[in-house]
Amino acid sequence: MQKSTPPEDLSRLTLLGREAKPSRKLETFPNRHPDRDYIVTMETAEFTCVCPMTGQPDFADLHISYIPDASILESKSLKLYLWSYRNEGIFHEHVTNVILEDVVAALSPRWCKVTANFGVRGGISITVEAEYKKPGWSKP
């Protein structure tokens, strides 16, 4: 088995190593271990969007975990994707589910879970968990 990343894995990546600006494009590269179930977790404490009613900023710790099938999510594209919500007026529950849907559309993972822990607003914190399981796949 090859130890380093083959050049063909890099050929589809258009955001890595380029100027950073918000983008709704999620990029992937091939999973070199598709025969194994393993969990990839990506986290950020810097997710922001805004309340669609007040325009006030909402801050969240965001955790995306998935068991890849054929593809792996490229982290810079995820960073730019999440950045694109910075000024988006969207409810917590909706944005968490949209992120899950977009990650699933990009990856077609065996399993994926997005957890968003939003900061306290009006004395209440909100945690939203959205989960996807590929039809026919069962967690070992």
Swiss-Prot record:
One of its GO terms (cellular component) is cytoplasm. Substrate binds at L73, E74, S75, H92, E93. It is an enzyme of class 1 (oxidoreductase). The keyword Oxidoreductase applies. The keyword Cytoplasm applies. Pathway: tRNA modification; tRNA-queuosine biosynthesis. It comes from the Bacteria. The active site is at C51 (thioimide intermediate), D58 (proton donor). Keywords: Cytoplasm, NADP, Oxidoreductase, Queuosine biosynthesis. It catalyses: 7-aminomethyl-7-carbaguanine + 2 NADP(+) = 7-cyano-7-deazaguanine + 2 NADPH + 3 H(+). It is found in: Cytoplasm. GO terms for biological process: queuosine biosynthetic process; tRNA modification. GO terms for molecular function: preQ1 synthase activity. Transmembrane segments: none annotated. Its EC number is 1.7.1.13. Catalyzes the NADPH-dependent reduction of 7-cyano-7-deazaguanine (preQ0) to 7-aminomethyl-7-deazaguanine (preQ1). Belongs to the GTP cyclohydrolase I family. QueF type 1 subfamily. NCBIfam families: QueF-II (TIGR03139). PANTHER family: NADPH-DEPENDENT 7-CYANO-7-DEAZAGUANINE REDUCTASE. This is NADPH-dependent 7-cyano-7-deazaguanine reductase. The gene is queF.
